[in-house]
Amino acid sequence: MSLLTKAAAEAWGTYLRQRDERCEDAIRCDYGVFQFRNTVFQKTLSMLQGLYLRQYDPPALRTYVQRHQGTTVALRNPANWFLVMREQAAIPQIYARSLAADYLCCDDTLEAVGVLAVRPPDSDLTRNTKQAQELPCVLMLSHYGTVYVYDWETDGLYEVASDIKAFSKNGLLWCEYVYRHPQTPFATTEPRYHVQKFLCTDPTDAAAVAKTAREMNGLNLVIRTPGRTEVEPLLMLGSIEGLRACRPFDHMPAADFRDLLNFIRQRLCCEWYVVGLVGYYLAYGPFVPSGMVLLDKFGVVYLHKIEDSDLYRIADNFHMFLKCGLLKLRGLCRFDRGLRGECRLEELPVCHHTLKRDVLRWHGALGTITRSQLESALDWFLRPTRGTDKVPNNSSAWGRTDLLPTGALQDNQNWAFPSHSVETLPALQGGLWEDNDETTQTVDGQRCFRMPKFFPPPMCRAPYNECGVELPGGDSSDEDESGRPRRIANRIGDTPETPCNSENEDDTTVEGTSGGPEAMDSQAPYPSEDSPTTEKEAWLQRGRRAKAMHARGHTLKQVPIPEPDQMGDDGPDPGP
């Protein structure tokens, strides 16, 4: 029997420790779960009240952090994570840096309040109950009370809560680093045999993960996303052939399907592997996919959304995907420096700054909130009867928001840890925050740069009016001689017309195809490089390609995927 890798062994141990064989009805106990969750919220908010009362007063906040430097505060989600108070001058990774100007989409000011730490798990027999391990994460507050976490290991800034009250309710649920930590429990645990097979696989070996998925072809993985009550099926495929046999890909013309494979290859700048499709099942049987889960050669997990036919990073590896699910596409906001967000293929973060300023301004509270007002609000949020007077009437809405999918959290009260006498071990000081290369440089001074996208017209034979009557001129100028939609690129300035990027790549063999598309120009306008050997090299290639496309005013060529109402029952339309 072959030995498991270190990552697989850690994941397997975490999975086994969180198993709870009790029936779900005994675990949930809806009213008890709601009351317990409210108790945890009030305990967390009471320990963060020093930050809550000073969140709109930066000088008072800095003085408070300096006075309580080294104090640990218990957090939630996960329950064994803590905040170690520390001023910004004592954190070299952020000292004398303007994180708001380098990362955020809008101007703001960020104040550091401390670093995060984690206590060893209860199952660790050698652990010291008086120690906690610091992590490469800094908790920060903005001028408008928004809570951020800066991860200097991956050089990312996460918006984890809109205010401290929401932070006390959800904890670190929206912090990406949580799901990279080996102690974080898995959200996806069923079917048990399927999950066990993946946990025994090296998460950095994309070919092995795809092979495991291929062995389960046609089966479903129950994907759970933390903070959400509904589940989603992941239909296992594991191969290009299996993908081609599923709708809507089986109704795509061969040329369009080949273009889709080449688009993914050129977007990733490396080889890739299919895992499966996420979506939902109709009552009468058919599976309606919303995206394709795939891996690059380094094991990073991406989702190709059918809605806009583009790729988005959803996890660093498949083990992390089993912990976070689709959280990165359900509201997790990550801000990157310079071009790195485009290089990592992160989804464009949603800007909440304008909305929050407008809300404060509408209530006449912009820059006028006093400490006495915050004290009154805190008195209301911490009222003793909140656990009973806020019980919802609809029991179906009582979904858990805790990371632990069972009642195991009740066995480990996160405020019972002796936080007044904790010794913290320093975290690793290195990380991507030290990088200063092409991926960290801005493009024309743009923040949160992403390549603009072109959405192709619908795949229909002829234009119709709103009543369904065919209009004259079916062979319009929007389609070329082959009947396929003509590529239209939005351009900046007066840049001359140039073919889109996927037509200018060097010939590349893609899994499931015999070769790449033919180049339309005698000389490719974008740099063509060798296959990367590290993820950092892939980032550099993606960044150079994005800058070259931006300089020429090109957009991403989206490959049209047929909608359900455009698919007949006789297979793919051969075209006119």
Curated annotation (Swiss-Prot):
Alphabetized InterPro entries for the sequence: US22-like
Pfam families: US22 (PF02393)
Name of the protein in question: Tegument protein US22
Keywords, alphabetical: Virion, Virion tegument
GO annotations of cellular component type: viral tegument
Gene name of the encoded protein: US22
Compartments reported by the entry: Virion tegument
Sequence ranges of Basic residues compositional bias: 542-555
Main subcellular location of this protein, as a coarse class: virion
Region (Disordered): 471-576
Biological classification of the source: Viruses, Duplodnaviria, Heunggongvirae, Peploviricota, Herviviricetes
Entry similarity comment: Belongs to the herpesviridae US22 family.
Biased composition (Acidic residues): 566-576
Presence of keyword Metal-binding: no
Keyword flag GTP-binding: no
